[in-house]
């Protein structure tokens, strides 16, 4: 995962710890994560709350926009490399559209959850639970940044080096 995350950092200018923290919050790093099924009368399934899917929990419409803009026609939401590239694109676009620093995990998460328009309108301000979740994402991002700083030199060497000398 480090190599894919490093490529995203280099391509989109996004620090590794921000999309990783958002991804943990959205899917707990599960490749096939989906929103829970909704039930009628407690036992009749009638679909999911949204089309979110995969590592990034990207909704179909937003994923399709990414595929077109980033020329990633073979990308898949359940592929880690593709999902983290999507997140890099999204975070980069959030900075461009809403002026949120790529390093600001708290407000990047609010952008990610509410969408660019929702963030711009301040829809999150009426959702105390979401602001609390964004604080958790920010705290986790800081933890991830510290962890990465302590081991990134080893990660850069690759798995074979770590196997024999790590």
Residue ranges and their predicted role:
Residues 153-166:
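Low-complexity, Gly/Ser/Thr/Pro-rich intrinsically disordered linker/tail segments
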Residues 1-155:
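Catalytic glycan-binding domains that act on GlcNAc-containing polysaccharides
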């Amino acid at each position: 995962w480090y190599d894919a995350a490093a490529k995203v950092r280099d391509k989109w200018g996004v620090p590794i710890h921000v999309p990783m923290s958002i991804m943990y919050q959205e899917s707990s790093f599960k490749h096939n994560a989906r929103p829970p099924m909704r039930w009628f009368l407690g036992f009749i399934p009638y679909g999911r709350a949204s089309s979110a899917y995969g590592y990034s929990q990207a909704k179909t419409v937003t994923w399709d926009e990414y595929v077109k803009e980033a020329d990633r026609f073979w990308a898949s939401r359940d592929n880690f490399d593709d999902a983290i590239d999507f997140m890099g694109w999204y975070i980069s676009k959030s900075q461009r559209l809403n002026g949120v620093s790529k390093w600001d995990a708290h407000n990047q998460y609010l952008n990610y959850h509410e969408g660019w328009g929702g963030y711009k309108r301040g829809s999150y301000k009426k959702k105390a639970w979401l602001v609390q979740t964004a604080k958790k994402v920010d705290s986790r991002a800081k933890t991830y940044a510290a962890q990465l700083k302590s081991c990134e030199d080893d990660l850069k060497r690759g798995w074979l080096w770590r196997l024999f000398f790590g």
